[in-house]
């Protein structure tokens, strides 16, 4: 194109788009529905809202104030002393199921067992299973234990008070040991035996393995005061 030629004007027809106006529903969404959509529930079933720790000394060590969807937070609770008190209590119970040698590291299997256990508890008791678990742990933590004092031939047993964190640790261990032993060579699954153990412990029944062990520890401590 030479310098004398004028540039050709190109006319384009642009379609005018009307401004979008959002549609407003005539009936607003109820607050209950909005809360249900935003609330975090364990396995999308069980709410943490009304769960209560009835023992004042264990409130800071039974973690139910941080809701979770699944019992696996991948947290590094072992890096610092006492940090495991911040671990959700359902996850601590799940981790305790992996303590037997052949179950080490099988977290997905343990999570499935806990999910099935909570369903069984809800069917049998018609209660929030998280509350049943918290009550069971509260009832099975021994308040008194014994320790060795002295050395050599003069060693003896001395009764001592148990710290809140150790009470929770022992309660979780006793509950899972009782469920594991009950499921061994039994037609019942470990989810069923764990559900029975938790329900009996929450009631304070002497049929619970954990309750019997707790009473035995406290009885021995009482005789060594």
Swiss-Prot record:
Q: Which Gene3D superfamilies does the UniProt entry name for this protein?
A: Ribosomal protein S7 domain
The entry's localization annotation reads: Cytoplasm
Spell out which residues are annotated as carrying Phosphothreonine: 27
| Cellular component terms per the entry's GO annotation | 90S preribosome; cytoplasm; cytosol; cytosolic small ribosomal subunit; ribosome
PTM characteristics? N-terminally acetylated by acetyltransferase NatA.
Gene Ontology biological process: cytoplasmic translation; maturation of SSU-rRNA; regulation of translational fidelity; ribosomal small subunit assembly; ribosomal subunit export from nucleus; translation
Glycyl lysine isopeptide (Lys-Gly) (interchain with G-Cter in ubiquitin) crosslink residues: 45, 203
Which positions bear N-acetylserine?
2
- InterPro entries attached here? Ribosomal_uS7, Ribosomal_uS7_CS, Ribosomal_uS7_dom, Ribosomal_uS7_dom_sf, Ribosomal_uS7_euk/arc
Quick check: keyword Magnesium in the entry? no
UniProt keywords, alphabetically = Acetylation, Cytoplasm, Isopeptide bond, Phosphoprotein, Ribonucleoprotein, Ribosomal protein, Ubl conjugation
- Name the principal localization, coarsely classed: cytoplasm
Q: Which Pfam families match?
A: Ribosomal_S7 (PF00177)
UniProt keyword Cytoplasm, yes or no: yes
GO molecular function, a single term: structural constituent of ribosome
So what does this one do? Component of the ribosome, a large ribonucleoprotein complex responsible for the synthesis of proteins in the cell. The small ribosomal subunit (SSU) binds messenger RNAs (mRNAs) and translates the encoded message by selecting cognate aminoacyl-transfer RNA (tRNA) molecules. The large subunit (LSU) contains the ribosomal catalytic site termed the peptidyl transferase center (PTC), which catalyzes the formation of peptide bonds, thereby polymerizing the amino acids delivered by tRNAs into a polypeptide chain.
How it assembles, according to the record, is: Component of the small ribosomal subunit (SSU). Mature yeast ribosomes consist of a small (40S) and a large (60S) subunit. The 40S small subunit contains 1 molecule of ribosomal RNA (18S rRNA) and 33 different proteins (encoded by 57 genes). The large 60S subunit contains 3 rRNA molecules (25S, 5.8S and 5S rRNA) and 46 different proteins (encoded by 81 genes).
Write out the similarity annotation: Belongs to the universal ribosomal protein uS7 family.
Q: What is this protein called?
A: Small ribosomal subunit protein uS7
């Amino acid at each position: 194109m030479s310098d004398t030629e004028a540039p050709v004007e190109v006319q384009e027809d642009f379609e005018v788009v009307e401004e979008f106006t959002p549609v407003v529903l005539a009936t607003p969404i109820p607050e209950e529905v909005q809360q249900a959509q935003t609330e975090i529930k364990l396995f999308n079933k069980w709410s943490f809202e009304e769960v209560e720790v009835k023992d004042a000394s264990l409130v800071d060590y039974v973690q139910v104030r941080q809701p979770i969807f699944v019992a696996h937070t991948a947290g590094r609770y072992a890096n610092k002393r006492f940090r495991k008190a911040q671990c959700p209590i359902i996850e601590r119970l799940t981790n305790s199921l992996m303590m037997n040698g052949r179950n080490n590291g099988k977290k997905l299997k343990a999570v499935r067992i806990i999910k099935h256990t909570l369903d069984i508890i809800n069917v049998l008791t018609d209660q929030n299973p998280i509350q049943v678990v918290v009550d069971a742990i509260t009832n099975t933590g021994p308040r008194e234990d014994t320790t060795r004092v002295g050395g050599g031939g003069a060693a003896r047993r001395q009764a001592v008070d148990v710290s809140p964190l150790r009470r929770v640790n022992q309660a979780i261990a006793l509950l899972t040991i009782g469920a594991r032993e009950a499921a061994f060579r039994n037609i019942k699954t470990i989810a069923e035996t764990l559900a029975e153990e938790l329900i009996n412990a929450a009631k304070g029944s002497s049929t619970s393995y954990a309750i019997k062990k707790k009473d035995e520890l406290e009885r021995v401590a009482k005789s060594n005061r």
